[in-house]
From Swiss-Prot:
It is an enzyme of class 7 (translocase). The lineage of its organism: Eukaryota, Sar, Alveolata, Ciliophora, Intramacronucleata. Core subunit of the mitochondrial membrane respiratory chain NADH dehydrogenase (Complex I) that is believed to belong to the minimal assembly required for catalysis. Complex I functions in the transfer of electrons from NADH to the respiratory chain. The immediate electron acceptor for the enzyme is believed to be ubiquinone. This is NADH-ubiquinone oxidoreductase chain 2. The keyword Chloroplast does not apply.
């Protein structure tokens, strides 16, 4: 039972990166302009596949036996673990040779012909913000001091979580409001919030 609870806590700490504002922004943009088209389903399917593969890997590595996040640096000796985590987070961030970049490029290309420059700049700004979070997570896996600092500053981690959850709630609101509101109004909301 204790191992299961620790595993759930670790999954919860990783959860903030999977449901990022960038991903919700991508879903909202896809729904607004493609009207539940093929790009939306491709994007959703590939993100869910990446998420499922990552959790499958975590279950098989028995990360549930860890007592805290700072002990994750013990896996630094396992090259495959570091490589897999690095590729996973870079894929979610949308770094060019990976599939996550291809999906973001499709959406960016579609936005280029459908909207104005301000909306594209907001989209790129959210992508840069999530890239910072993904790269700082990868750095904490490699750097032993930073991994131990994560346990020392739980208050700051919780503040960051609450900030991200607020934005996730806001984008879920916009995501579901699409079905009830005109898409022009949603673009107006996204430009000012």
């Amino acid at each position: 039972m204790r191992a299961h609870l620790l595993h759930c806590e670790l999954a919860f700490s990783f959860g903030k990166y999977f449901y990022s504002t960038s991903f919700l922004n991508l879903l909202m943009i896809n729904l607004m302009f493609s009207k539940l088209g093929a790009i939306f389903f491709l994007n959703l399917a590939l993100y869910l596949l990446a998420l499922a593969l990552f959790f499958f890997f975590l279950f098989n590595v028995k990360v549930a036996l860890l007592k805290s996040v700072s002990q994750i640096y013990y896996f630094n000796n396992i090259f495959f673990f570091k490589f897999f985590v690095l590729i996973f987070f870079l894929n979610l961030a949308g770094i060019p040779p990976l599939l996550g970049f291809f999906l973001k490029f499709l959406i960016f290309f579609f936005l280029f012909f459908k909207t104005n420059l301000a909306f594209i700049l907001i989209f790129l700004g959210f992508n840069m913000a999530t890239l910072f979070f993904y790269l700082s997570t990868v750095k904490s896996f490699v750097n032993r001091k930073q991994a131990s600092v994560l346990n020392s500053f739980n208050f700051f981690i919780r503040a960051e979580l609450s900030f991200l959850y607020f934005f996730n709630f806001f984008y879920f609101f916009l995501f579901f409001a699409f079905f009830f509101l005109d898409s022009t109004f949603l673009i107006f909301l996204n430009l000012f919030f």
